[in-house]
């Protein structure tokens, strides 16, 4: 192999290492059996969720995962492999891929990592059922507002009752 080819592959490995390091999560899938239309639809759904899916050679993935500290993932790099990287919402790839895999049997989730922790297929399925960060924050805000709102209604009722007593 020429030095130029080796340099190109080394650069490709470094690019993938950077993707691993910048991502809050990465989910590895086997896309064997998907049609071009299905892959295009999956990429669109992932893009809308802020996730980027890349098809990367297994040897490059193996080397990049080792360098990035995710060598435990090397067992899942076999066959046609794509990786969905998310730099923002760590749960987004799991949600989109799980939903898509439920509707299309050909997509197989193999494993990945979420916020630095290697996760199994079962763990990915659990994460996929969790509400998003925004949904959790909205629920928390609603729960925090409820007691204040109840006190405000109680004070208003007392004031209204006092006004009725003054009128009589």
From Swiss-Prot:
GO cellular component assignments: large ribosomal subunit
PROSITE patterns: RIBOSOMAL_L10
Keyword Transferase: no
Entries under InterPro entries matching the protein: Ribosomal_uL10, Ribosomal_uL10-like_sf, Ribosomal_uL10_bac, Ribosomal_uL10_bac_type, Ribosomal_uL10_CS_bac
GO molecular function: large ribosomal subunit rRNA binding; structural constituent of ribosome
Keywords: Ribonucleoprotein, Ribosomal protein, RNA-binding, rRNA-binding
Keyword Acetylation: no
BP-aspect Gene Ontology terms: translation
Assigned protein family: Belongs to the universal ribosomal protein uL10 family.
Annotated function: Forms part of the ribosomal stalk, playing a central role in the interaction of the ribosome with GTP-bound translation factors.
Quaternary organization: Part of the ribosomal stalk of the 50S ribosomal subunit. The N-terminus interacts with L11 and the large rRNA to form the base of the stalk. The C-terminus forms an elongated spine to which L12 dimers bind in a sequential fashion forming a multimeric L10(L12)X complex.
Record protein name field: Large ribosomal subunit protein uL10
Organism: Levilactobacillus brevis (strain ATCC 367 / BCRC 12310 / CIP 105137 / JCM 1170 / LMG 11437 / NCIMB 947 / NCTC 947) (Lactobacillus brevis)
């Amino acid at each position: 192999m020429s030095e130029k080819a080796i340099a190109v592959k080394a650069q490709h490995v470094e690019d993938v290492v950077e993707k691993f390091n910048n991502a809050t999560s990465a989910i590895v899938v086997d896309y064997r059996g998907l049609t071009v239309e299905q892959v295009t639809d999956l990429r669109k759904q992932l893009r809308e969720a802020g996730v980027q899916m890349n098809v990367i050679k297994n040897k490059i993935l193996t080397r990049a995962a080792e360098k990035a500290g995710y060598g435990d993932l090397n067992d899942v790099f076999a066959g046609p492999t794509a990786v969905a990287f998310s730099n923002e919402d760590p749960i987004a790839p799991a949600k989109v891929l799980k939903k898509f895999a439920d509707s299309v049997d050909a997509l197989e989730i193999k494993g990945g990592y979420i916020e630095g922790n290697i996760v199994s297929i079962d763990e990915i399925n659990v994460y996929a059922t969790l509400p998003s960060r925004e949904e959790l924050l909205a629920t928390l805000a609603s729960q925090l507002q409820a007691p204040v709102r109840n006190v405000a209604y109680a004070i208003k009722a007392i004031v209204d009752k006092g006004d009725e007593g003054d009128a009589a």
